[in-house]
Amino acid sequence: RVLTEAPYLPRCSDDKTATRVRPREYAIRYPYMQVNRPGFVSWLIFDLDHTKAMIWEDAGLPAPNLIVRNRQSGHSHLYYAIPPVCTTEAARSKPIAYMKAVYEAFAARLAADTAFPRGPVATTPGHPWWLTHELHAHVYELGELADYVDLAVSSPWGKGPQFDEVSHSRHCILFEHLRHYAYSIVNRER
């Protein structure tokens, strides 16, 4: 499924920079590649920066489809297959928000790196650099995954202004106040 859901020309490289674009038949030869197509998410990938790859059992979560483990450090990526969710500008915002809520709830339970999904690449399953374990081929519905966690309801713009993290000039404080107000207006108009 990784090969069929990957883009035809995924980004790939020998490191996390994803500097090359190759056909997927060649991209799987690189240790890092783009597994989700642009504009679609078919895999929820969790980056575990600890050595407990089986933490999903202790957390009471369903088994991932794939576990891709680093041979040296023991860190791993957990891959959960889901039906493709469109993330383009033409997509509906509710399914995207639902997918993000499920992802964040799983990431919290798995003690996963929450900054991981910002990049396009992940470890390539089956590459010789990694130990890859395929547990099953089941494709999880988002509702099925959501049954295992409590979804937090949060605003899309965060927790509000963090005045301790900005400089104390009046311009920065004014910007922090206004940007959250603007986010609420934009969200209401969508």
Question: Which residues are covered by each model-predicted region?
Answer:
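Signature for HUH/AEP ssDNA processing cores
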Residues: 1-76, 82-97, 116
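Generic low-complexity, intrinsically disordered sequence content enriched
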Residues: 7, 13, 25, 135, ...
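A residue-identity detector for tryptophan
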Residues: 43, 56, 129-130, 157
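Generic surface-pattern signal
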Residues: 61, 107-115, 183, 187
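Flexible helix-coil linker/hinge segments at domain or subdomain boundaries
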Residues: 100-145, 150
